Amino acid sequence: WVAMRIPDNAISAHANQARIQQIKFNDPDNCLYAPDVISFAREKGYFNGPDEEFSFCDAYAPADFGTVRGCDARVWAFFRTVADDMDQYTDYAMGYNMSNRMPLWVKPRTKVDPKTVFDAMRDHYEGTPMDMTQDIGAGGHALPYRWRPMEFEVDGVSYVNERATATQQTGFWFVAQARPWLPDDMGILWFGVDDAATSCLTPIYCSATEVPEC
């Protein structure tokens, strides 16, 4: 495992795929890691280069078309809504240029508020080349839903169903909001049941000890 401190003026995101590359071994204030993070990778045959070239995600979760298109593309969709110049990574998000990696974090144009995160969780790649409301699978009603599998073949030709942030098979979703100027008990968990794109969020205080009657 490895953990990186995100700068106070930046945001980061992960979507079921490791993204941390180089580890800052001599910066304990900003980077923590398992003592055997490299030796274990060597033992398992995941890495055989010099320590200074070790990349955590390349060793333990190497990216391919499926992981980039199905996972990192969701990170890209979020980043492009809050930060400038993210369209330069469109070819990476679509799985076409694996060397054009996105940064681990980006500096947003303005402070990110809860509503921005709510909207990001409801995304179907609208306004991008992967817009699920515009391709042939959307039908006549611009339906942004695709039933699995994500990859399929017809008459020897391979096709892809996008894996958007919002999906119909979601059981629940939430956004945690910490407000440092208020007591800890005033922290809020915005909680929703089912598909993020079609469900509402209910604020639940972290001090709650029982479920209220509705």
Report each predicted region and the residues it spans:
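C-terminus-biased signal that marks the final domain/tail of proteins
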Residues: 1-214
